[in-house]
């Protein structure tokens, strides 16, 4: 039986369990003690260091790609474990690592109080060659263009679309690669970065660091890199850093103002309400940051969901039905599907949409799940369809969530708001009567929910067509909707209906 090495920040482990990583769910180990130590970093990635060796018998070359990266990455304690090699195999990860799909018993543990000091010991014994910034082997270009090439290749390898955002962190840590990055952006038809963008990107990553201190962003390294390559930016970057020494409310204002820049068309008054809520909160700074960070994570999730490409004919020719319970959405959408010979998709159909509903437990709140369901279904459409929303799928109390939903649904040309009457109280009465006809034991919760759906303005704001359904049969409703779509009457529909109401 041979022995392998594994590094972990956790001490006292009697067995190592497989963990999901880049290559799959494995326990990782290596034949080389020095390599296990080099993997003990607490943070950092390919943008902060490079690791390789020229041949199997040569020393590992560890290159610091940004100032002070080694101190940041390795200023931690860790444990070096030995494990038997019996269940491990080589899947060619790119390093001299072996993997095991099953849990592994540990044979021994050696606690290392400072990983960086241990690496220096390995350097003195010629097992590792350290290159402190800006020193580097000749094979690594001084302008860091190799990192730009790696970013492009990674996008190709993972089949992820290359966007301007793909290069943000690269530019944040390696502003000297600006010209090379812009060359790649020109290839994909994107507007180039300028030096002012570097300031905005620095601000963005500074806020990330403030919101979640446990995730190291290498702020100090970025500051030094920007100052070195663009001395004219040093004063403004320094002023951003100074916010770390300001008062709690000043830091919170800075965080929120920076986040708001991402949402230029978000209603200013609603943003001010959110800002005032946090500025007047009795919660600790740490709790406020945690709460805001959770919102940012949710926003990132929503942005990722709604940014997917949707075929233009789907956006132009699909018909989306929204409205409260009992508004005849399901009946009308079924008949419309038959008339137009278009597939119908119901967001309440748990069986057909099982792959989405099975993920319900992954979301903290039901509204988070509803947003995921709605956006996933809409962005997965390949051909025009009739989409039947559930009553709550288009109503969001959270202003940011509604803002994101609005950005998605506004891409669709035909969004039909089904409503019994232009008078809200009359609508509520008719809707509840319909619910009772459907189920005489209908709970008051449904009635209360309908009142909420009617009083919220969400459906009115996102719809392009408003169809009043009282005293009309389904065929008549369908004919009216088709006529409005064909004649584009819906552009002035709200004005005409309000005049008719008067």
Residue ranges and their predicted role:
Residues 365-409:
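Glycine-rich phosphate-binding loop used to anchor ATP phosphates in small-molecule kinases
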Residues 338-371:
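Conserved substrate/cofactor phosphate-moiety recognition/catalytic segment
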Residues 276, 280-313, 456-502:
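NTP-dependent small-molecule kinase module
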Residues 324:
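P-loop (Walker A) phosphate-binding loop of NTP-binding proteins
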Residues 330:
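Walker A/P-loop
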Residues 23, 42-212, 216, 222-226, ...:
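Conserved NAD+-utilizing ADP-ribose enzyme module
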Residues 55, 410-458:
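A glycine- and Lys/Arg-enriched "phosphate-lid" helix/loop adjacent to the NTP-binding pocket
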Residues 1-24, 39-42:
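ADP-ribose/NAD+-binding catalytic cleft of ART/PARP-like enzymes
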């Amino acid at each position: 039986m041979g022995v392998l090495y594994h590094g972990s920040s956790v001490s006292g482990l009697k067995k190592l369990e497989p963990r999901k990583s880049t290559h799959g769910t494995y326990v990782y180990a290596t034949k080389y003690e020095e390599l296990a130590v080099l993997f003990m970093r607490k943070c950092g990635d390919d943008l902060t260091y490079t690791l390789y060796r020229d041949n199997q018998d040569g020393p590992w070359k560890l290159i610091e790609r940004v100032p002070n990266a080694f101190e940041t990455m390795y200023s931690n304690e860790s444990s070096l474990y030995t494990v038997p090699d019996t269940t491990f195999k080589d899947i060619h990860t790119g390093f001299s690592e072996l993997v095991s799909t099953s849990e592994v018993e540990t044979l021994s543990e050696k606690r290392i109080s400072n990983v960086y000091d241990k690496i220096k010991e390995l350097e003195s014994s010629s097992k590792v060659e350290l290159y402190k910034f800006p020193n580097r082997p000749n094979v690594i270009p001084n302008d860091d263009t190799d990192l730009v090439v790696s970013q492009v290749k990674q996008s190709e390898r993972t089949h992820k679309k290359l966007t301007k955002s793909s290069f943000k962190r690269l530019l944040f840590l390696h502003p000297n690669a600006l010209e090379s990055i812009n060359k790649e952006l020109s290839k994909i038809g994107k507007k180039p970065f300028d030096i002012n963008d570097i300031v905005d990107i620095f601000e963005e990553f500074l806020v990330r660091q403030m919101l979640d201190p446990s995730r190291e962003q290498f702020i100090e390294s970025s500051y030094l890199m920007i100052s070195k390559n663009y001395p004219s930016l040093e004063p403004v970057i320094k002023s951003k850093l100074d916010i770390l020494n300001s008062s709690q409310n000043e830091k919170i204002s800075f965080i929120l103002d920076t986040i708001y820049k991402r949402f230029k068309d978000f209603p200013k008054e609603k943003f001010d309400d959110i800002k005032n809520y946090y500025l007047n909160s009795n919660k600790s700074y740490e709790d406020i940051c945690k709460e805001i960070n959770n919102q940012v994570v949710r926003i990132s999730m929503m942005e990722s969901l709604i940014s997917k490409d949707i075929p233009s004919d789907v956006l132009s020719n699909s018909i989306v039905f929204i409205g409260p319970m009992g508004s005849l959405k399901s009946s009308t959408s079924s008949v419309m599907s038959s008339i137009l010979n278009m597939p119908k998709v119901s967001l309440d159909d748990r069986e057909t949409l099982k792959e989405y509903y099975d993920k319900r437990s992954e979301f903290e709140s039901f509204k988070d799940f509803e947003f995921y369901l709605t956006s996933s279904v809409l962005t997965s459409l390949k051909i025009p369809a009739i989409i039947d929303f559930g009553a709550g799928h288009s109503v969001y109390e959270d202003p940011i969530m509604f803002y994101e939903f609005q950005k998605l649904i506004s891409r669709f040309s035909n969004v039909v708001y089904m409503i019994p009457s232009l008078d809200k109280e009359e609508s509520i009465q008719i809707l509840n009567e319909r619910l009772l006809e459907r189920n005489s034991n209908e709970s008051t919760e449904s009635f209360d929910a309908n009142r909420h759906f009617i009083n919220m303005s969400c459906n009115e704001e996102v719809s392009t067509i408003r169809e009043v359904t009282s005293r009309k049969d389904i065929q008549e409703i369908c004919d009216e909707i088709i006529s409005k779509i064909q004649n584009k009457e819906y552009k002035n529909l709200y004005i005409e209906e309000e005049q008719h109401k008067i």
